[in-house]
């Protein structure tokens, strides 16, 4: 499976999350302005709380939409095994006997999809593991995470 396929799978995953978040934000907006949240006294804050929730959910939906947009135009360069890990690299690693793949990408961090029967997790620059992997080479052992790099592409 190519990196472009992983990115497409991550975009599909995020699009599903976006649909759920947009529906939740719409419902929260309705709850904030609906008859059922009309204030019944000066200490009744249901409408205010619902409006805060609607705002936060709308912001989260915008973040997910932005991530999808960034990933759809992201074209990672090929990486040879002798090259150091950089943005766009697909890293195969072993951690305590478990094989896992990481794709270093500009957005979509934390998303996990299947790659060759294993989990592939997207790491972004905000991640400490992303920062630890940058510049590492095939065969390196990352001391702080006990992660052995088995392959890069």
What function would you assign to each model-found segment?
Residues 34, 63, 77, 143-145:
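Alpha-helix boundary/interfacial micro-motifs
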Residues 1, 7, 29, 36, ...:
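Mixed-charge, polar/low-complexity N-terminal
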Residues 55, 59-99:
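Long amphipathic N-terminal alpha/beta scaffold segment
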Residues 80-147, 153:
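Non-DNA-binding regulatory cores of transcription-related proteins
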